[in-house]
């Protein structure tokens, strides 16, 4: 049993008159070019940990909208977010016990049937502490 638990969900974000609305994406959801996708990663940690790396892989049809790598602060947690071609990496010097939610937007750029990658997390100095999310397929039409 690992102290790390990951859950990854994709949401379709649509703008309405009352503001943005997000709806969960599943295997039956039909996406189209230009859609805005919100990635939500929920991380549960049952003990304090140091030097942890989380890698969120994405489908070839998705492009990140914020491409600048930077240090971020959120809910008392400091981490470095590094956006790359096929994945977004999160580096934690210190990861306190608790539950954390990370979100970032993606844009749909290609049609087809894709496997959206999994999210993995691992302690850099104690690799036996590792976990991963499940993958999901996405279908993109016109």
Task: Name these PLM-found stretches.
Residues 1-142:
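C-terminal segments of large proteins
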């Amino acid at each position: 049993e690992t102290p790390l638990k990951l859950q990854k969900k994709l949401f379709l974000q649509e703008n309405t008159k009352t503001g943005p609305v997000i709806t969960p994406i599943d295997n039956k959801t039909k996406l189209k070019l230009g859609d805005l996708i919100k990635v939500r990663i929920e991380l549960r940690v049952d003990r304090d940990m140091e030097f942890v790396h989380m890698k969120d892989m994405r489908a070839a049809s998705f492009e990140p909208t914020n491409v600048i790598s930077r240090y971020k602060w959120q809910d008392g947690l400091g981490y470095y977010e590094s956006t790359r071609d096929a994945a977004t990496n999160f580096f934690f010097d210190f990861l306190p016990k608790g539950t954390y939610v990370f979100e970032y937007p993606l844009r749909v750029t290609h049609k087809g049937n894709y496997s959206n990658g999994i999210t993995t997390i691992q302690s850099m100095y104690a690799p036996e502490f590792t976990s991963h999310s499940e993958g999901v397929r996405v279908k993109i039409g016109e």
